[in-house]
Amino acid sequence: MSRDSGNDSEVAVTHGEVQEITEENPEIGSMHITQETDISDAPETNTDSSRQRTESTTSVSSESWQNNDEMMSNLRRAQRLLDDGATPLQIIQQIFPDFNASRIATMSENAHFAILSDLLERAPVRQKLTNYNSLADAVELFKTKKHILVLTGAGVSVSCGIPDFRSKDGIYARLRSEFPDLPDPTAMFDIRYFRENPAPFYNFAREIFPGQFVPSVSHRFIKELETSGRLLRNYTQNIDTLEHQTGIKRVVECHGSFSKCTCTRCGQKYDGNEIREEVLAMRVAHCKRCEGVIKPNIVFFGEDLGREFHQHVTEDKHKVDLIVVIGSSLKVRPVALIPHCVDKNVPQILINRESLPHYNADIELLGNCDDIIRDICFSLGGSFTELITSYDSIMEQQGKTKSQKPSQNKRQLISQEDFLNICMKEKRNDDSSDEPTLKKPRMSVADDSMDSEKNNFQEIQKHKSEDDDDTRNSDDILKKIKHPRLLSITEMLHDNKCVAISAHQTVFPGAECSFDLETLKLVRDVHHETHCESSCGSSCSSNADSEANQLSRAQSLDDFVLSDEDRKNTIHLDLQRADSCDGDFQYELSETIDPETFSHLCEEMRI
């Protein structure tokens, strides 16, 4: 949890990215914790202490789409324990027994308050529906459902030439090197940082400015859902306006767009095209009236999200019969909470390059969004197949065809049984290669030997060589023990194939994952800088040659030796996202919270 931006709003920095939490958001807004001290005596919170996207306070009393009984119950229980004198660490241990509190025992109380706040705000764990699993199930859902809610992120625009944010080659990775003074990559969308230094934003803006790109297969698929009367709403986190370019009408641009701009000094309004020249030249656009900096009407951290979003979600949550998340990491609230606000029996599909540890979709289709959507379109047939043909024709006419020709028909599915047989074969081959080679026994020099001094020297060199071999073999074995063999799934996807690696996970080209032959589980490939792909301000080193970086097993607390300075209240928690390896730390915290601030923030969680 981080500081508020007013009496009616509340923010949390959890689950790897800044998340919007306000009193409009009764999941948090209904909560209340206060210490024995009068809340009126609580210190004013510092609006500069955290990045946030907050919603309009005008709809506080009317929006209740994020109610959650479990979170309410936990907060009330935390309130009682706090009133009884329990420490934040003790509260964590009692309310969240599955959380490994021993890992944070040596941290400061302020850090414990921050972690407790984050745990109380975490999105509820969604229970997977057992009757929806396979790619075929997904196709059937698209055929039969009539009120499909599609939530899209940057992944749907990658094939258009627009970089995403968190991949190894994404915008955040490049900002780290190009703007070393940037506190962290997400500061590019911090309204306070923008006012001080708009250059990083304008450096990035050129890459997604409207008018340069052709909508992707994924955009056209969503439009066809709308045309066929199946689309309830497209909630997009993107600001590239490609939904409008595609002709999608039932779209909510959750985070705004470049279509309109405003002077940050005098409020003069501009059309997005009026700053086109400056944006494409990577120059900061200035107001013609007062020379103030012009900002596109994109929702920055620290600005109102707007009322339209909440009104639509409140209406749609009761109508939706299928949720489809395409190309989003679901790390930014409140959009990330949409899958958790609908009826528990509504099936949900994830189409993304990687599995999301904080989101239990019923069906996971992992890989490049367009490759997956193409396969679904071929299965649906009719107008959906025609849109693929039309898209390919446009790309060919514009000379934008890829070196590797996209699939022209449905992919051949490697079944889960066949996949596991391949894994077992690979494991047997790997085990056989690990068998130690027999070496001849070392020969000692007999006392009565009359070998020359030269022979003695050769014998010593022979022993030394064998010892070196032993050392190398030991190192190799140790590596294999620490880092089990990973099977590259992408090698199986040639010749227009996809792989069912589990009952509910199907892998396509572009998936950022491998298969662990030891645990028989899917593991994420590491992006740039291991676990620094989100909004943490700490710097992290990346060792491309390290085998540990093959897995998403970002460092847990076991890997850290915290210095005395780290344990002070100013500690920048090295609790980065641990992804699939440690469920305790599927979020990150950017700062600590003192008890008074914790009390003040929780007071504002009530309706």
Swiss-Prot record:
It is an enzyme of class 2 (transferase). GO terms for molecular function: deacetylase activity; histone deacetylase activity, NAD-dependent; histone H4K deacetylase activity; metal ion binding; NAD+ binding; p53 binding; transcription corepressor activity. It catalyses: N(6)-acetyl-L-lysyl-[protein] + NAD(+) + H2O = 2''-O-acetyl-ADP-D-ribose + nicotinamide + L-lysyl-[protein]. It holds the Pfam family SIR2. Disruption phenotype: Reduces the longevity-extending effects of nicotinic acid when exposed to 1 mM nicotinic acid. Defective ascaroside-mediated responses with neither ascr#2 nor ascr#3 inducing lifespan extension or conferring thermotolerance. Reduced germ cell apoptosis in the gonadal arms following DNA damage induced by UV-irradiation. RNAi-mediated depletion results in an increase of 'Lys-16' acetylation of histone H4 (H4K16ac) on dosage-compensated X chromosomes in hermaphrodites. Residues 55-64 have a biased composition (Low complexity). Gene3D superfamilies: SIR2/SIRT2 'Small Domain, TPP-binding domain. Residues 1-68, 426-453 are annotated as: Disordered. Residues 128-401 form the Deacetylase sirtuin-type domain. Keywords: Cytoplasm, Metal-binding, NAD, Nucleus, Transferase, Zinc. Belongs to the sirtuin family. Class I subfamily. NAD-dependent deacetylase. Involved in metabolism, apoptosis, response to oxidative stress, response to DNA damage, and determination of lifespan. Required for a reduction of the 'Lys-16' acetylation of histone H4 (H4K16ac) on dosage-compensated X chromosomes in hermaphrodites. Plays a role in germ cell and somatic cell apoptosis in response to DNA damage. Functions upstream of daf-16/Forkhead box protein O in the Insulin/IGF-1-like signaling (IIS) mediated pathway, promoting daf-16 mediated transcriptional activation and increased lifespan. This is NAD-dependent protein deacetylase sir-2.1.
